[in-house]
Amino acid sequence: MEDFVRQCFNPMIVELAEKTMKEYGENPKIETNKFAAICTHMEVCFMYSDFHFINERGESIIVEPGDSNALLKHRFEIIEGRDRNMAWTVVNSICNTTGVGKPRFLPDLYDYKEDRFIEIGVTRREIHIYYLEKANKIKSEETHIHIFSFTGEEMATKADYTLDEESRARIKTRLFTIRQEMASRGLWDSFRQSERGEETIEERFEITGTMRRLADQSLPPNFSSLDNFRAYVDGFEPNGYIEGKLSQMSREVNARIEPFLKTTPRPLRLPCGPPCFQRSKFLLMDALKLNIEDPSHEGEGIPLYDAVRCMKTFFGWKEPTIVKPHEKGINSNYLLAWKQVLAEIQDIEDEKKIPRIKNMKKTSPLKWALGENMAPEKVDFDDCKDVSDLKQYDSDEPEFRSLASWIQNEFNKACELTDSSWLELDEIGEDVAPIEHIASMRRNYFTAEVSHCRATEYIMKGVYINTALLNASCAAMDDFQLIPMISKCRTKEGRRKTNLYGFIIKGRSHLRNDTDVVNFVSMEFSLTDPRLEPHKWEKYCILEIGDMVLRTAIGQVARPMFLYVRTNGTSKIKMKWGMEMRRCLLQSLQQIESMIEAESSVKEKDMTKEFFENKSETWPIGESPKGVEEGSIGKVCRTLLAKSVFNCLYASPQLEGFSAESRKLLLIVQALRDNLEPGTFDLGGLYESIEECLINDPWVLLNASWFNSFLTHALR
């Protein structure tokens, strides 16, 4: 390293560095990494000052070498490199003549143009950490900090970089060259790892006692102490590690990096086949509600009481008929199941006191619909291991499905506003700190934008259904319990409203493991004629059960009312997450918050109010075949919420895989847009891992279609 320093740096810089080290009692021949660091730092300080002058009008100008600068004043006073006494004399003189406050530590430069001292930092570590250490040590707003790293990054106080871009680029290029030269001689790793943080009293603390013992116990295998582990992590060079591993692998492994250009990516291949079908646990845009306003009946709040009252508001019941059969099911059983529900609700009404819960009679149509006695008998393995042809039963490969337009319509509908408010967030109490005030202000603005959103209705509906079903599954394991599908909201005038969407009948539910399945039959009201999009309703048997009179601009119109019936299933873990669907509100609020934070850091003040109240500004919402769609901040809030809700409603392994794998391609494309010249290897393998998730799930297929739109417009 010493030889490298003497070859690489100007002899004057080497001499100054040696003098500085001797002044502090350090030996350049022993502490060679420190020797190199001091030379680098001095060279950066001199380059910072080079060619910068102040003319007779007090303007900062750049004079290239060879041009006349005899009458010009140097813009920067160099303090770094002087002996301590002389350096402090210069600093005191500057303070006396300019009135600038005296710094606690010796700075590196003084800027006569901006009238401030400058502390220059050159780091081999993470630039933000080094900057914070410097700021912690100096603790002065008078001294301007400017940090350079060997990777071409820089950071300065208030993002004020003092010099023009070309001067800074010269410094960065020189640092990069030093790094390359060191690396070619095998000196870089040792030099990089030798840097210590800025030592300040506040940071010099030891982990001792119980915490130390816990830290030593919590290490990965093969590490004896926390210090060993820290040393390993600090010295870990991921690229070198990966290259080393690759070199140990077979010769057939080809990891040649290919440049990723605008012409490189191709669209994702979406599967062909019949159109995909609706697979959510309850109806979304097609749901119909029977409701009561300002409920005040006896037992109000008890689901069965509320359901009976809602059923009484409808007078158009008629003899049910099948209008769209289920291809593989015994449709008459679904019809009989609905008739049984109607009859048993009538029985409830005839009783003097309505029961709190209703268990259905175990009729043969219900037993069939709920899969009673259909599960294969479990046999102990020891009893059958001698069977010669023992094998796992064959399972069919999933059938490929194509994207259908209904899922985009569902998403659009979820982003819309309804005429009711679905959110009643509890009061959290008075704010006691400024940050709490900002947080509640953001929460209130966000709540105002999404409380009437249809996606919020889906959240409340999902929470109710999953909670009721999980409770019933645990409390009445053997019963076919009737569970009303209910939600509550407030009208624009503030009146309370109770809504009934239909009913669920729960099957046997001895759920020992999280993934054990409970079957249920859902029966949901709707005005949607299933014959318009029969492919959407593949899994349903649909009955016509009545006529509903609707008020329209041209008078009253009678529309047929349908009942969408299907057998479905869920598990404890799915119900547990369904009960926590309110998390979607938090997730989308955090996404909005990060947008506000980005805006606030640019403007250096909190922009929450302006962000939500500037109605004229539009924001990007998403990609469509037409290009980037834009909308108000409210539309952005509702779109982000709807995406989060659909991720919950359509959760699946296909979605998990697609999200994880497509994110990699997205990051590469974004790097290309940011002119970072990304390189890739095995791009075909990445496409394969994305496309193997595109099978039949409607939400995944829609996301893949959006991704293709993004690729088209991002790479124009």
UniProtKB/Swiss-Prot annotation:
The record ties this protein, via InterPro entries, to: INFV_PA, PA/PA-X, PA/PA-X_sf
Give the top-level enzyme category.
hydrolase
Could you tell me one molecular function GO term of this UniProt entry? Answer: metal ion binding
- Positions binding Mn(2+) 1 in this chain are 41, 108, 119-120
Its cofactor is: Mn(2+)
**Cofactor remark from the record:** Binds 2 manganese ions per subunit.
Q: Where in the cell is it found?
A: Host cytoplasm; Host nucleus
Report the leader peptide range. Answer: none
What does UniProt say on post-translational modification here? Answer: Phosphorylated on serines and threonines by host kinases, including human casein kinase II.
Motif Nuclear localization signal 2 (NLS2): where in chain = 184-247
What GO terms in the biological process aspect are recorded for it? Answer: cap snatching; DNA-templated transcription; symbiont-mediated suppression of host gene expression; symbiont-mediated suppression of host mRNA transcription via inhibition of RNA polymerase II activity; viral RNA genome replication; viral translational frameshifting
Report the EC code(s) recorded for this entry: 3.1.-.-
Which GO cellular component does the record give, naming just one? host cell cytoplasm
The UniProt annotation places Mn(2+) 2 binding at 80, 108
What keywords were assigned to this record? Cap snatching, Endonuclease, Eukaryotic host gene expression shutoff by virus, Eukaryotic host transcription shutoff by virus, Host cytoplasm, Host gene expression shutoff by virus, Host nucleus, Host-virus interaction, Hydrolase, Inhibition of host RNA polymerase II by virus, Manganese, Metal-binding, Nuclease, Phosphoprotein
The record's annotation in Pfam families points to: Flu_PA (PF00603)
Q: How does it assemble?
A: Influenza RNA polymerase is composed of three subunits: PB1, PB2 and PA. Interacts (via C-terminus) with PB1 (via N-terminus).
- Similarity section: Belongs to the influenza viruses PA family.
- What's the stated role of this polypeptide? Plays an essential role in viral RNA transcription and replication by forming the heterotrimeric polymerase complex together with PB1 and PB2 subunits. The complex transcribes viral mRNAs by using a unique mechanism called cap-snatching. It consists in the hijacking and cleavage of host capped pre-mRNAs. These short capped RNAs are then used as primers for viral mRNAs. The PB2 subunit is responsible for the binding of the 5' cap of cellular pre-mRNAs which are subsequently cleaved after 10-13 nucleotides by the PA subunit that carries the endonuclease activity.
Q: What is this protein called?
A: Polymerase acidic protein
